[in-house]
Amino acid sequence: KDGYLVNKSTGCKYSCIENINDSHCNEECISSIRKGSYGYCYKFYCYCIGMPDSTQVYPIPGKTCSTE
């Protein structure tokens, strides 16, 4: 599964700065929790490729992004 990393508690995407945080996004995507193949920063958010179907990506159905 491919998609944007999402914070399950806030429903928001993981933010990043393109060309600066690519390695951070990759580490998050290939972590033992998410088990993705590769990750990078795309349009200011971490995007992952090759994650298991069970891994939640943005958007979470029925949940909007809220940082409050």
UniProtKB/Swiss-Prot annotation:
Free-text tissue specificity from the UniProt record: Expressed by the venom gland.
Keywords associated with the record: Disulfide bond, Ion channel impairing toxin, Neurotoxin, Secreted, Toxin, Voltage-gated sodium channel impairing toxin
Single GO molecular function: toxin activity
A GO-annotated cellular component: extracellular region
LCN-type CS-alpha/beta domain segment(s): 1-66
Function statement: Binds to sodium channels (Nav) and inhibits them.
Family to which this protein belongs: Belongs to the long (4 C-C) scorpion toxin superfamily. Sodium channel inhibitor family.
Name of this protein: Toxin Cg2
Taxonomic source organism: Centruroides gracilis (Slenderbrown scorpion)
